[in-house]
């Protein structure tokens, strides 16, 4: 016995629905989902995309005074001096340098939140804008974020 095409197609969908209606609804739903997904925040591409918070930079300033100012001034980490060494270098390199070598009298003693706060302070001193999400100690992600100053 041969089943007419119309009956075969209707048996795939729920009873009472036409096959084209089901396909159209699915296609429209998929399109709307893609459209909504594209409306979300875009991933940051550099340190100019607000990868730290102002509160984090403020905390970093206090940590800099406590742990770093004995040997360093913030000018060493800002402007042309910073750019000459760190321009286009991934943020992960700065994280690693601070985490593994500072402070000089106790290298490696700073925790992740302290290191990222110090980085936020350095970014702030270089005019890199703050954002709404704190900088996290995610080295894989930081490895994709080049350090750039405004005007670069």
Question: Can you say where each PLM-predicted feature lies in the sequence?
Answer:
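Bacterial N-terminal signal peptides that target proteins for export
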Residues: 18-28
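C-terminal motif of bacterial Sec signal peptides marking the signal peptidase cleavage site
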Residues: 36-38
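Electrostatic cytochrome c docking/interface patches
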Residues: 40-62, 106
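The canonical Cys-X-X-Cys-His
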Residues: 60, 64-74, 118, 122
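Electron-transfer interface patches adjacent to heme c in soluble/periplasmic c-type cytochromes
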Residues: 77-96, 103-116, 134, 149-151
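Flexible coil segments in periplasmic/lumen-exposed cytochrome c-class electron-transfer proteins
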Residues: 110-152
């Amino acid at each position: 016995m041969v089943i007419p095409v119309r009956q075969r197609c209707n048996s795939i969908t729920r009873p009472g629905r036409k096959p084209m209606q089901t396909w159209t609804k699915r296609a429209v739903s998929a399109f709307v989902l893609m459209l909504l997904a594209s409306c979300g925040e875009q991933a940051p591409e550099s340190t100019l995309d607000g990868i730290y918070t102002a509160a984090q930079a403020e905390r970093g300033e206090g940590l800099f005074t406590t742990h770093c100012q004995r040997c360093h001034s913030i000018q060493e980490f800002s402007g042309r001096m910073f750019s000459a060494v760190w321009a286009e270098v991934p943020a992960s390199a700065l994280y690693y340098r601070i985490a593994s070598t500072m402070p000089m009298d106790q290298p490696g003693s700073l925790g992740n939140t302290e290191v990222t706060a110090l980085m936020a302070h350095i970014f702030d001193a270089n005019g890199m804008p703050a954002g709404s999400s704190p900088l996290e100690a995610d080295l894989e992600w930081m490895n994709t974020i080049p350090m750039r100053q405004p005007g670069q």
